[in-house]
Amino acid sequence: MRKFDYSFLNNGLLPANLVNLTSNIAALKTMAGVRKEEYTQIFTELEAVAKVQSIKSSNAIEGIVTSDERIAAIVNQNSAPLNHNEAEIAGYRDALNAIHLDYEHIDFRQSDILRLHEMMMSFAGYEYGGQYKTDDNVILEIDADGNRRVRFRPMPASETPKAMEQLELAYLDARSDANINQLLLIPCVILDFLCIHPFRDGNGRMSRLLSLLLLYKNGFDAGKYVSFEEQIKNYKAYYYEALRQSSAGWEANENSYFPFIENFLSTLYMCYKELDKRFAVVHGKKITKKARVEATVLNSLTPLSKAEICKILPDVSPTTVEAVLGAMVKTGSVKRIGAGRATRYIKA
């Protein structure tokens, strides 16, 4: 039987790169907290954008897709799903909304985990929503020649309820240890959840929801304003490689959590860095959208396109970005390079 024991996080023998990552994240978290108090409206707008990106990306990782227009309608207007994929997306929307609105009262307990899974599966009409798997499952991979092979055998269905009970208790025990850094603990728990693979379907999406839940409960809420799931999707090859490395030997209690911890923390760090970019202005100035566009271009060491600026500042409309860039070109503070789609802007 797999044993869940996180006491190794309390022995002081942690890789230096992980310790440095947690320190860097903590510093960015403090800065974000100060900004959130001062710029409430900007954070509200960023949250609305990130929610759409999170729902789109987490489902896309699993091959569940629809058009951007339909994603926005489902998320922002509660539009009724038109097909099976959209039903899956609507379920994820509801589960994510529940976490955003009520994370303080949702915990890493079996009852809450099952309820979130049921919510996520509700629109798709699966009868197994909110229930652990009843049949064993395997995780397959396909090689370059098209041959399938078993990459990982998760916990058997018969042992899953007991394993989830032990996982819950191990987490609650480690959470109460003041000497264990919660940023290191959370990815360990998420890895174990993925290796148990407790549900017939939806384990990957549930792991991302639970990641956000535990991060929010510990005050690390960058994923509310810069999509955590989108960062995973953008670098999913690294994510799956870290998962592969950390799950090797898991059944025999011989795995190393460190590759997955590093990937998880790197993803969170990227969220905080992206959030920091969106406030790239001189401290003390009123942060208007115009000022943020100007600072983004003026502080960049490389030429930026309008699309790149819009990605850095998703709450600022393309029309506003274009107007500010035009004014900056006229005043001579920036110069335009190239033409058409190849147009870039750089400090003059």
Predicted stretch roles:
Residues 1-348:
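FIC/Doc superfamily catalytic core
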